[in-house]
Structures are given as structure tokens and as C-alpha cells.
A protein has these predicted regions:
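Transmembrane beta-barrel wall of Gram-negative outer-membrane proteins
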Residues: 248-280, 293-342, 370-372, 542-544, ...
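N-terminal periplasmic accessory domains that precede
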Residues: 103-105, 147-150, 189-191, 218-240, ...
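Short, acidic, small-residue-rich periplasmic hinge/interaction motif at the N-terminus
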Residues: 29, 40-44, 78-82, 97-140, ...
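Outer membrane beta-barrel strand-and-loop segments of large Gram-negative receptors
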Residues: 433-437, 478-483, 594, 600, ...
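Short acidic/polar hinge/loop motifs at secondary-structure boundaries
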Residues: 180-208
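Short, acidic Ser/Thr/Gly-rich low-complexity loop/linker segments typical of extracellular
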Residues: 46-62
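Surface-exposed extracellular loop regions of Gram-negative outer-membrane beta-barrel proteins
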Residues: 517-519, 553-600, 615-633, 751-765
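Outer-membrane beta-barrel signature, preferentially recognizing the C-terminal barrel domain
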Residues: 483-490, 566-619, 637-648, 657, ...
């Protein structure tokens, strides 16, 4: 027994001796000494192929592997577009518990696309000092989806049932495409994002507080959608085709190509497809007298079918007269031909809930949306790692048209036809935007990075609404609804930005000036007088970003940022138009809208570049919201300024990769919002607490199969007058790489059909109202993609557009 006890004691001591607090540290850079973020590091026992642990490099390229077992090891490092690196063997034991590896330099890969399968990938989320990056290519269920559906899965981003996009609880988000503003908003922005296939999106840049380099417009911040671009010399092209099946069937097809030599880079895309979806809407309104007694009710069902096709094409050429200079031109054209039919049946009831009359409405719309754009740019680097100067000139033109015929049959309580009305509308619009900007960058004393620039933009819009009452086949002008509105706007801006990285602290300071001159002119008619307005305002917009590393390995980081923003009204919202949806529902413009201003603060903690927690506070004056007014039982929807809005939110975003084949992404947001403003009914004051949560899990299976499950849920929430019920959805997707050239992806959205939009509308004059909308959120999507080509090392320099804010302010209707 004594011998056995001694033997067990020796074994335990030996086992204890082999358990150590080991640490392996290092830094990964490319051949130009630039740190590589999100490179995959694998720890292996010498002569054994299976890794025992994985890590991902931080934003500064550093990594830390904690390991408790003694032995002889080697590490490998991989990153997309780079050759694999393997270290020399090293030992971890009680005498050598820590190993600081020499600098790891990854070399650019030279590959033939048809002959290699890249197994390393970027993480779903990356954190920078002034933005969050979402790598869309890491989401397999993006296949067959649209840009709008991709945005719904991004951390902190919420797309409400009306298509309005909020970021960390804030409205007024500006959408950019490849550093160029979309100049779209409302229904037009929603339509555009639905027409943009997810297969052409590489990354989302989410900036809740954008730096001074970006335009100050957009109280909610900026979401920059970066499309896929080939950065290597050689040639490549890709083709993808997808089909979406729900109640109706839609298709989406995409082609992209790139060819680069020492002197030229030619690239382009072409997308074509059709949209085919629906909204099934139930509306209930209860009318009351001053004592709260019911005087009548209105119940309506509307089935709206939206369909139509279109295409999007772009072509760009870069010329490299020298290694230091790039001259480029980019042209693009977007054509869409949306159509819709709205079949509505509404019944009016008296105070005893007996049918009084009914309305049967048919609203047919036939539209067109054409956007042409040209960008000229030049960039010159005066020396390697030295000053650089970039200039852009942009011209954009939007031509839209919408022909509308609204027919309403009015029936008595017995079902007899009482009257028949027909209203025809013709609504052409034109928007022209001219913009020019310059940007200068220089490093001062090898410490401070200086950025400075200036911008000029001029926008001219013309919106016409011609309405006619059709009686017995004869058209008579309806001057009450007919309107012609013109609007001119000039913005001049300049900015200065300074950035410095100290030992553990990164500081970025910015100041932007913007001066605005605007003029609106409504041409009169026989019923309406001619009217106009002029406005001028000049403002400063400071920004501050701080990022502090609590340790040398960037495992624990603190960040803080502050910024001031402006929310300029959308161009068409200033147009005092009136557009009927049916006999009792109208959309109206507001020429008296004022710009809104907000101050935003954010404090955050980042753990190992995987978990980020943030606290956000904002104070906004004159925020623009949709408002609802009831007059003579008619429902008017118009944009209006909400006097003061304060918002406080707490958020967490987490990314886990516990196994090589398993990935988790979790996001959550708690929001408190307080609205207070003068209103149609007196004072509007809304206090609201709600939460939003999102989860994603991805499995990498054998034989090049990948599976993904994700979902989200939003609790009951309020937005000015709107009270939305809680809703959520679950999505499923699976992907198979058939060969290095061919990938097939299948996914189902809203599997359990829980994404139903319903709620109430508050603060209506002597009226209660609620709604329920069923859309084709549940759908099956199948996408097949093919890619081939040959590429060698070489990168296209990033060129930004000069039109950086105006494109977010264009609307369809």
C-alpha cells in the first residue's frame, strides 16, 4: 500500500508539473509591414496534423495563445489572399512558459482561381477605432438575398416594417455605396436595396459616429455598403443566378468582371432581375366624439402586389501613368420599371356597428426609375508612405415617373352603387446633382496622420404632379392636388482630421464646416398661389475618437467617441405634394421641414476583438418623423419635425469560433427613447423601452458543406405615433461548394412566418387606429454561382467619390 501511495503521489506531481500557464505571442504583418487583422493562427503539436487551438489576430496584427500543456509546438498563420506560413518548432514547459515568436510576414498569394480553394476566411465582425466592419462574404445565407435583408442581420441595425433603417436606435441613417452616397431614401431606398443582390456585397462599414472626412448629414450615422472588387492583377469573372419562391416568384442574375495589367484596370458589373412581392394589410379605425363615445368605425383590407423588372450596370477604368498616380472614370446606369396593383375593400360602420357604406378601390401604378452617374477621379502619392492628394468630380441624374389610376366605387349599406370616382395622376420628377471634392493626407513627424479636404455640391430638383378627375371618360384637372415644385441647394464644406497612435492610446480629432444655401419654389395654379422660400445656415461639426489598449496584446480595449450631426430633409419631402393611396388615405409633403441636429456619445469595451459592449447617448432637436393626422375621417401621412428626442442604449456584439467548424455571432440592444414635441393634438410625448436581439450559428461540415441558422426578435416598440408589436423571424441556409468554380446555396427566410407587422397609431384626433401587415417574408431561395480567372499580386487603389452625402436624399414617391 505504501509503495502504491508513493507511486500515485509521484504520478500526481508529474502531472501537475506538466500543467503550466503558457503563453505564445506574436504579430502578423504583410510585406509592407502593415498589420493583418483577423488572420487565423493554428497551434499544432510537432508531427501531428490536427490543430489543438485556434486564435485570430487583433486589429494591430498581434495575437495571444494561452496553453497549459507542455510540449513542442509549431504554429501556422493563414489569411485570405496570402500564402500559408509555418513557424519553426518551439518548446513550452515549466522552464519556458512563454514564447515570443519573431515577426510573421505573410506574402501575397499568386493563384489561379480555378485551381485553389481558399479555406481561411474573415470573421463576421471586425472592430476599428471609428467603425464596425461586417464581412458579408462570411454569411452563407446572404446568397439569393438582397442588400436590405443583409442589413437586417448587421449588428445594431434594424429595418422597421415601413422600411426605415435605424442604427443603435437612431433614425436618419445615411446609406453609402462604395463610399458614395446612395442619394435615396424612404420607398426608393427600400426598392433600390431590394434590387441590389447580396452576392455583389463584400462588406458593410457601420459608423454610428462618422469621422470628419464624411459628410455631416445623417443623424443616425452612416452604413457604407462595399461591393465586391477584384484587387489582384490578371483577369477574373463571376456569374450568379438566383430564384426566390414565395407567393410569387422573383429572379436575380449577376455578372462581374475585372481585368488588370501594369497600366490599366478595367472592371464592371451587370445585374438584372425582377421583383415580385405583396403586402396584405388590415386597417381598423374608430372615430369618437369629444366625450369619447364611438361615432363610427372603418375596417379595410388592402392587397398590394408589387412587381417589375430592371437592371443595373457599371463600368470603370483606372489608368496608372506611374506607380504614384491613378486616374479613373466610373459610369453606371440603373433602370427599374416598378408596377403595383392595390385592391382595397373598406366598410364604414355607424355608432351601432351597422354597415353604413363601403368603398371598393383599385389603384394601379406604372412607374420608371432611371439613374445615370459618372465619376472622374485622380489620386497621386508624392512619395512612398508620404503625402497623397485625391480629387473627384461627380454628376448624377435621376429621372422618375409614376402613372397612377385610382378608381373608387362607393356602395350603400344595401350594396347598391352610390357613386364611382376615378382619379388619374402623372408624376414625373428630375434630380440633378453636381459635386466635387479634394482630400489630402500626410503623416507629420512620423507620428500624426493629417487629413484635410474640401467639397462643393449643387442639387437641382423638379417634381411635377398632374392630377385629373375622370368623369364619363372626360378628364378635368384637379388643381387641389396638382403641383409643380422646384428646389435648389448648394453645400460648401471643409474638414480637418488628425490621428495619432501612442503606446496604448489612439486619438483621432476632427472638425468639419458645412454651409448650406437652399431655395424652394412652388409654381401656382388657378387655385393655389405661387410661393417660395430661401434658407441659409452654417455649422461646425466636431468629432473625437479614443481607443485605449489595457494590455499589450489588445485583449482588452476601451473606446470613446463623440460627434455632432445634421439631418437635412429629403428632397421630395420638401415638396408640398399630395398623393392618394385610396379614397381615405393620402401621403403629403412638407415644405416647412427644418434640418435636425444631434449630439452623440458612445463608450465601449472590446474583449479580444470578439465581444464589444457599448453605451450610447444622443440628443436630437427637430428630428424628422412620419406623422399622421386625421381630418374629416381622412388619413394624412406627412413628414414632420419632432421637437426633441433623447436616446440611451446599451448594446453587446459577440463573435465566437470555439471549433474550426463552428461559429457563433450574437447581438443585443436595449434602448430607451423619449420623444417630446408640439403636435396636431397638442403635445406628443412618448417614452419607450424596447430590446432587439439577434443570433447566428454556422457549421462547417464535411465535403465542403456549410449550414447556417440565424434569427432575430424585436420587442414592442414605439416610434413617435407608431406602436409596433413584437416580432421576429428564423432563417435557415445551407451551402455546397461543388468545385472550386461552382457553389450552390439554398436558404429559407422566416421559416415559421413570424415576421408579421402589426401595431397601433397613437395621438390621433378623436380616433383610434391599428394595423396588421402580412408580407412575403417566408421564401425559399436557390442561388448558383460560378467564378474563374487568373490573378497575380497587385492592388487597385481605393478611390472615393466626391458626392458623399446628397444621394441619400432622393425618394421614389
Amino acid at each position: 500500500m505504501a509503495v502504491m501511495a508513493i507511486g500515485l503521489s509521484i504520478a500526481c506531481l508529474a502531472a501537475k508539473a506538466q500543467t503550466i500557464a503558457g503563453k505564445i505571442t506574436g504579430k502578423i504583418t504583410d510585406s509592407t509591414q502593415q498589420p493583418l487583422n483577423a488572420a487565423t493562427i493554428s497551434l499544432r503539436i510537432v508531427n501531428k496534423p490536427k490543430p489543438v487551438k485556434y486564435e485570430v489576430s487583433a486589429t494591430d496584427g498581434t495575437f495571444l495563445i494561452e496553453w497549459r500543456k507542455a510540449g513542442t509546438y509549431t504554429i501556422t498563420a493563414t489569411a485570405v489572399g496570402y500564402d500559408r506560413y509555418e513557424s519553426a518548432p518551439f518548446t513550452i514547459d515549466s522552464l519556458h512558459p512563454e514564447s515570443a515568436l519573431p515577426a510573421i510576414i505573410l506574402k501575397k498569394a499568386v493563384v489561379a482561381l480555378a485551381a485553389v480553394t481558399v479555406t481561411s476566411k474573415k470573421p463576421f465582425i471586425e472592430q476599428k477605432v471609428d467603425r464596425t466592419l461586417v464581412n458579408v462574404e462570411a454569411m452563407i445565407n446572404s446568397a439569393g438575398s438582397t442588400a436590405l435583408e443583409v442589413l437586417e442581420k448587421a449588428p445594431g441595425v434594424r429595418v422597421d416594417p415601413n422600411g426605415s433603417i435605424t442604427l443603435k436606435g437612431q433614425q436618419g441613417v445615411a446609406i453609402y455605396i462604395d463610399d458614395k452616397p446612395s442619394y435615396l431614401s424612404g420607398q426608393q431606398l427600400q426598392n433600390y436595396l431590394q434590387s441590389l443582390p447580396a452576392t455583389v456585397i463584400a462588406q458593410l462599414e457601420i459608423m454610428s459616429n462618422p469621422p470628419a472626412k464624411y459628410d455631416a448629414s445623417g443623424n443616425g450615422g452612416i452604413i457604407n455598403i462595399k461591393t465586391v472588387k477584384e484587387k489582384m492583377k490578371g483577369y477574373n469573372f463571376g456569374i450568379s443566378s438566383g430564384i426566390r419562391v414565395s407567393k410569387y416568384t422573383s429572379t436575380n442574375n449577376n455578372l462581374d468582371f475585372n481585368y488588370r495589367t501594369n497600366k490599366f484596370n478595367i472592371f464592371g458589373t451587370f445585374s438584372a432581375g425582377n421583383r415580385n412581392n405583396f403586402n396584405d394589410i388590415d386597417i381598423y379605425r374608430k372615430y369618437m366624439d369629444d366625450d369619447g363615445n364611438t361615432t363610427g368605425t372603418f375596417m379595410q383590407n388592402s392587397f398590394i402586389h408589387k412587381f417589375g423588372g430592371g437592371y443595373r450596370a457599371s463600368l470603370g477604368v483606372d489608368y496608372f501613368p506611374s506607380k504614384k498616380t491613378t486616374v479613373g472614370v466610373l459610369v453606371s446606369r440603373l433602370e427599374r420599371y416598378p408596377k403595383s396593383t392595390n385592391r382595397s375593400l373598406g366598410t364604414l360602420y355607424n355608432e351601432n356597428h351597422q354597415p353604413d357604406s363601403s368603398l371598393n378601390s383599385n389603384n394601379d401604378e406604372n412607374g420608371s426609375f432611371i439613374n445615370n452617374r459618372i465619376n472622374l477621379n485622380i489620386k497621386h502619392d508624392f512619395s512612398k508612405n508620404g503625402p497623397s492628394l485625391q480629387a473627384n468630380v461627380d454628376y448624377l441624374e435621376y429621372n422618375t415617373n409614376n402613372d397612377q389610376v385610382l378608381t373608387t366605387d362607393n356602395y350603400t349599406s344595401t350594396g347598391s352603387l352610390k357613386s364611382e370616382d376615378q382619379l388619374a395622376g402623372y408624376l414625373p420628377a428630375n434630380i440633378r446633382i453636381y459635386a466635387a471634392k479634394t482630400d489630402y493626407e500626410q503623416t507629420i513627424a512620423n507620428q500624426w496622420k493629417l487629413e484635410a479636404g474640401a467639397k462643393f455640391s449643387y442639387t437641382k430638383t423638379s417634381n411635377v404632379a398632374n392630377y385629373y378627375n375622370v368623369i364619363a371618360g372626360v378628364s378635368e384637372p384637379d388643381y387641389d392636388k396638382t403641383n409643380h415644385f422646384m428646389y435648389d441647394e448648394n453645400i460648401n464644406a471643409g474638414y480637418l482630421n488628425l490621428n495619432r497612435m501612442f503606446n496604448k492610446l489612439t486619438v483621432q480629432l476632427g472638425l468639419r464646416y458645412e454651409g448650406t444655401l437652399s431655395k424652394g419654389h412652388q409654381l401656382g395654379n388657378v387655385l393655389k398661389p405661387d410661393s417660395s422660400f430661401n434658407r441659409s445656415y452654417n455649422n461646425l461639426f466636431p468629432t473625437l475618437f479614443l481607443l485605449y489598449k489595457l494590455d499589450t496584446n489588445s485583449n482588452h480595449q476601451l473606446k470613446f467617441n463623440y460627434g455632432r450631426r445634421i439631418g437635412r430633409p429629403y428632397y421630395q419631402d420638401l415638396n408640398p405634394f399630395i398623393s392618394p393611396l385610396d379614397k381615405l388615405t393620402f401621403y403629403v409633403g412638407n415644405p416647412y421641414l427644418k434640418p435636425s441636429f444631434s449630439s452623440k456619445y458612445e463608450l465601449g469595451y472590446i474583449f479580444r476583438n470578439r465581444i464589444t459592449t457599448t453605451i450610447n447617448y444622443s440628443d436630437t432637436r427637430d428630428q424628422v418623423n412620419e406623422t399622421i393626422e386625421i381630418n374629416d375621417q381622412k388619413y394624412y401621412s406627412r413628414p414632420g419635425n419632432i421637437g426633441k428626442t433623447t436616446s440611451l442604449s446599451f448594446g453587446i456584439d459577440a463573435f465566437f469560433n470555439p471549433k474550426p467548424w463552428l461559429t457563433f455571432q450574437l447581438s443585443g440592444q436595449m434602448n430607451y427613447i423619449h420623444f417630446k414635441s408640439s403636435f396636431y393634438t397638442g403635445t406628443l410625448e412618448v417614452k419607450n423601452q424596447y430590446y432587439y436581439t439577434q443570433a447566428l450559428v454556422q457549421f462547417k461540415l464535411k465535403n465542403n458543406w456549410t449550414m447556417q441558422l440565424d434569427g432575430n426578435y424585436t420587442s414592442k416598440s414605439k416610434n413617435a405615433q407608431f406602436v409596433f408589436a413584437g416580432r421576429g423571424r428564423v432563417n435557415y441556409s445551407v451551402s455546397k461548394m461543388v468545385s472550386p468554380k461552382v457553389t450552390v446555396k439554398f436558404n429559407v427566410t422566416d421559416v415559421f412566418l413570424t415576421g408579421i407587422n402589426k401595431g397601433d397609431i397613437a395621438n390621433l384626433k378623436l380616433t383610434d387606429a391599428n394595423f396588421r401587415t402580412l408580407s412575403d417574408t417566408r421564401a425559399a431561395l436557390l442561388t448558383v454561382s460560378f467564378r474563374m480567372g487568373k490573378r497575380v499580386e497587385g492592388q487597385r487603389k481605393k478611390i472615393e467619390s466626391g458626392a458623399d452625402a446628397e444621394q441619400d436624399r432622393v425618394k421614389d414617391k
